[in-house]
Structures are given as structure tokens and as C-alpha cells.
Amino acid sequence: MRDYYEILGVTRTIDEAGLKSAFRKLAMEHHPDRNGGCENAAGRFKEINEAYSVLSDPQKRAAYDRFGHAGVNGPQGGPGGFGGQGFDASDIFNDVFGDVFGEMFGGGRRQSNAPQRGQDLRYDLEITLEQAYAGAEVEITVPAAMTCEVCEGSGAKPGTSPSVCGTCGGAGRVRATQGFFAVERGCPRCGGSGRLVLDPCSNCHGHGQVRRERILSVRIPAGVDDGARIRLAGEGDAGARGGPRGDLYIFLSVTPHELFERDGLDLLCTVPVPMTTAALGGEIDAPCLLGGESCDGECKVKVHVPEGAQTGKTVRLKGKGMPSLRSRQRGDLVVELFVETPTHLSARQKELMRELAGLCGEKQNPKSANFVGKAKRFWEEVTGS
């Protein structure tokens, strides 16, 4: 199999614009309609299209550059592999030449007046970290196109029927000749439907659909992360001419929490610790999210503070983080300690602090003593004394 870059006559460093220009030139030169249906031209044209379909797709091009034809000729010819299956020259021509030339390829195969699937819809939903942690059932209101209940989707007034378009004869497409090309395009009179509604339905005004708001219940699974997507099949817009409904895609956004940050399945939380507790050791309460067995029904959990704890020390509580979507695993709650210096001291408290300071030395403050020693050596090196 020939190298795709060689087929298009370009180097491996060519940019997108150069690639498109090279393809356009070769496609026009080798198009079968310009070569009297020559089999060699048809084969060359197919080869050019295949090469461009891979190199114009960043992911496929990266796979091809790394693995060659093996990287794009997957067994299914699907995402990540071209393989020649599912290839439609009209998709490429629409991209490069526009609709006029794109409609020439496969246009006759596409039945504009056939049942059409409804549009997919997107709904952005904000949820709390608590809802992401425990799961939730949320009601949303979604506007969507519904089949008109009066005309049952025909667009025509009850008791009447749409007429066949006289321009396209019901095909939904018309054919015209432009230079070397025989071009098919959507019928301008009926809009490609092949039918004309002469007496429109008063409820949908001839569209066959009306827009309505629907209330849907959405189940948020425990453990979802920010940016997760939920698909509700058949909850999108109604299809045209009896086609199936589209799907509804719900994109989740988890609002920032005032206490917790999420890191994968772990929850991170900074908790202030009294100076005395940090020095002597002890226990403090840390917040945790309610749900399951992680906090035993409480919204706080006991954290052991080791003697001499410093700011920035972390304590990891196993299994008290977020649940996993795909297993029974749970993350951890990671508590970062922040040693709090007391303020607004009374005279007696200040006196005791001074007394404590006089009793503390290098043994009690090893980091301070180490820092002083380093600073002293630095000063001696600078001054030469």
C-alpha cells in the first residue's frame, strides 16, 4: 500500500492549509467525470480521497505517522482506523469544495424525504459535591421539539395531506449541470422534503413539530466527576417524517466546595490545629461528607494529631473519600494540618508564652536551630569573617 504523503505529493511536515490545497488540485485533476469514467482515474481518485481522509484528521494522522497503515486500518474501520469502511467522498468534498461539489457524491443515495432522526440536545447541569458523593435524583426542565399532536407530524391541517412537490417530483432533490459536473442539490421549493404543505396546521404552522418544555428526572450516580456526561436515549428532539427521537446529553459541572477539593477519588481538606494540640498531640474533628459508611452517619471524623505536628503535615484517612463509579473502591480523606498561632493574648498568657520561650531550646525547635546555623555560615562566607 502506497504512502499517503506520497499519494498527495506532499512532505510529512505539511500544514493543514497546504494539505487541503494539494488534495483540491489532485481531486479536480483525477475526478472520473473529468476523465470520461476512466477506471484508472477512478482508482486514483479513490486513493487520493483515502489519503486525505486520514491525513486531514489530526488523530488519524498522528496514528499513521507513528504506526503507518497499521495504525489506521483497524479491523472495524471505525474511530482510530480508516480501513476504507464507512468512507463517503461527499464528506470530504463538503469540507474542501463546499456544498455544490459535495452534493455530487452520494447525493442520490440520501433520501431527503425519508424519515430523519431528531436532533440531539445538550443540557448543562450544576450539582454539588455532596450530590456527586452520594448520588442524587434531580428534576430538570428541557425544551424540546415534539411531534405535533394535532396533525401528527404531517404539518398539514387535519383532513388534508401534503402535496407532492412538482419541482422535484417528490424526490426532494433536483439535478443541474455545471461545467464538467452533474450536480444534485436539495430542492429549493420544498426544502428537500419532497412535499408541499398547502393548507398548514394551525397548531404547528406547517412544521409538523411544536416546542414544549418537559420535566425529566435524572439519576446522578454516586462518584461522578466534574465534566461527566449522562446520555438519556430518545429524550432529544422529535424526528421528522416518523424518524426516531434524538438523545439528550447532560453535562455535569460540580460546583466548588468551601471545605473540600477533589483529587481523583481523594478528598483534600485543610483543618486548623491549636498550637498546644500540635505541640502535645491529640485529636481534632475534621469534616467529611455524609453518606455510606465513611463517617458513621456523622458529618465529622476524628483525626489523630501526632506530637510536634507542623503546618503542612497530612493525615490520610483510608476509605473516607469519594466512591468509584465502576467499583466498590473508595478514595481517602487527606487532612492537611494548619498550626494556628494564638492571637489576642491576655497579659498572663503572654507571660506564660515568654516563660515557655525561655525554656525551649534547639531540642524543642530543631528546624529553627538548623536554619540559624545555615544563616550564620552563609553570613560568614559572604563577609569572610
Swiss-Prot record:
One of its GO terms (biological process) is DNA replication. Keywords: Chaperone, Cytoplasm, DNA replication, Metal-binding, Repeat, Stress response, Zinc, Zinc-finger. SUPFAM superfamilies: Chaperone J-domain, DnaJ/Hsp40 cysteine-rich domain, HSP40/DnaJ peptide-binding domain. The keyword Zinc applies. Residues 3-68 form the J domain. Its cofactor is Zn(2+). Gene3D superfamilies: DnaJ domain, Heat shock protein DnaJ, cysteine-rich domain, Urease metallochaperone UreE, N-terminal domain. The keyword Cytoplasm applies. Zn(2+) 1 binds at residues 148, 151, 201, 204. Zn(2+) 2 binds at residues 165, 168, 187, 190. CXXCXGXG motif repeats lie at residues 148-155, 165-172, 187-194, 201-208. Binds 2 Zn(2+) ions per monomer. Coiled coil: none annotated. GO terms for molecular function: ATP binding; heat shock protein binding; unfolded protein binding; zinc ion binding. It is found in: Cytoplasm. A zinc finger (CR-type) spans 135-213. GO terms for cellular component: cytoplasm. Its main location: cytoplasm. The J domain is necessary and sufficient to stimulate DnaK ATPase activity. Zinc center 1 plays an important role in the autonomous, DnaK-independent chaperone activity of DnaJ. Zinc center 2 is essential for interaction with DnaK and for DnaJ activity. NCBIfam families: DnaJ_bact, PRK10767.1. Belongs to the DnaJ family. Homodimer. Participates actively in the response to hyperosmotic and heat shock by preventing the aggregation of stress-denatured proteins and by disaggregating proteins, also in an autonomous, DnaK-independent fashion. Unfolded proteins bind initially to DnaJ; upon interaction with the DnaJ-bound protein, DnaK hydrolyzes its bound ATP, resulting in the formation of a stable complex. GrpE releases ADP from DnaK; ATP binding to DnaK triggers the release of the substrate protein, thus completing the reaction cycle. This is Chaperone protein DnaJ. It comes from Caulobacter vibrioides (strain ATCC 19089 / CIP 103742 / CB 15) (Caulobacter crescentus). The lineage of its organism: Bacteria, Pseudomonadati, Pseudomonadota, Alphaproteobacteria, Caulobacterales. The gene is dnaJ.
